[in-house]
Amino acid sequence: AEELGIDKDQRDTVSFGAVLHDIGKLGVYESILNKPGELSDKEWKVIRSHPEVGANIIKNMKFLESACDLVRHHHERLDGKGYPDGLKGDEISIGARIVAVADSFDAMTSDRPYRKKHNYHEGIDSLRRQGEKFDLEVVEALVRLIERGTIRE
């Protein structure tokens, strides 16, 4: 967020949202989260509910109110094919776009039950190829942080 020139209040909101973005997964069975194989349609529906569940968990906590948007919209995509609300482009807050890139990069560069992690170079290449989904300005900010050594493998 700082790399993009966002003001301190918004950076604080992004920090809270980044920490809490997957809090809704508390409502998802561990067997689904850690399933090594393909998810069924029913399991995908449960997984796809976690942003709404997470937003509902924090929406009445006054000090976390500003992060609610980031928690709810971190799976929205620039092309409108994300969830839960199908937002696209500038309808998605900059904070949610930052968390989306960070979350996806983290997922790509971490081991999962269904695949081995990618290295940072592969993760960045993947994000760049998915420009219809992710804000490329945010992706390039991540690249600069990695190149400077602020973020390390």
Language model features by range: what are they?
Residues 1-153:
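Metal-dependent catalytic cores of enzymes that make or break cyclic nucleotides
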